[in-house]
């Protein structure tokens, strides 16, 4: 079933109330307008990826900006 359009965006309460957000483990939280201009570190499962929040990111999820998979490196033929 699809998500209803009448539901508000999800954001962890701790993120919305804290003014000094630096590390984010909640990748499912939506980016709100109050985060614009801040630099946050988003956890990708292994390390924290620094990311500066811009106005274009509002409404997206934090997890979209920290990839969790490595790109494959193929051997070159000699």
From Swiss-Prot:
For the keyword Mitochondrion, the answer is yes
Q: Which gene encodes it?
A: RPS19
Q: What is the lineage of its organism?
A: Eukaryota, Viridiplantae, Chlorophyta, core chlorophytes, Trebouxiophyceae
Instruction: Please list the GO biological process terms of this entry.
Output: ribosomal small subunit assembly; translation
Q: What is its main location?
A: mitochondrion
Compartments where found: Mitochondrion
Gene3D superfamilies registered for this protein in UniProt = 30s Ribosomal Protein S19, Chain A
Instruction: Report which superkingdom the organism of origin falls in.
Output: Eukaryota
Q: Which Pfam families match?
A: Ribosomal_S19
Output a single Gene Ontology CC term carried by this record. Answer: mitochondrial small ribosomal subunit
**Mind listing the UniProt keywords for this protein, alphabetically?**
Mitochondrion, Ribonucleoprotein, Ribosomal protein
Q: What is this protein called?
A: Small ribosomal subunit protein uS19m
| Gene Ontology molecular function: any one | RNA binding
Question: What family classification does the UniProt entry report for this protein?
Answer: Belongs to the universal ribosomal protein uS19 family.
Q: Which InterPro entries match?
A: Ribosomal_uS19, Ribosomal_uS19_bac-type, Ribosomal_uS19_CS, Ribosomal_uS19_SF
Q: Which organism is this entry from?
A: Prototheca wickerhamii
């Amino acid at each position: 079933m699809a998500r209803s359009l009448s539901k508000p965006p999800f954001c962890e309460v701790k993120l919305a109330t804290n003014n000094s957000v630096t590390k984010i483990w909640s990748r499912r939280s939506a980016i709100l307008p109050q985060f614009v201009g801040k630099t946050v570190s988003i956890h990708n499962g292994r390390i924290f990826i620094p990311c500066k929040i811009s106005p274009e990111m509002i409404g997206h999820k934090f997890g979209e900006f920290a990839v969790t998979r490595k790109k494959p490196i193929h051997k070159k033929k000699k």
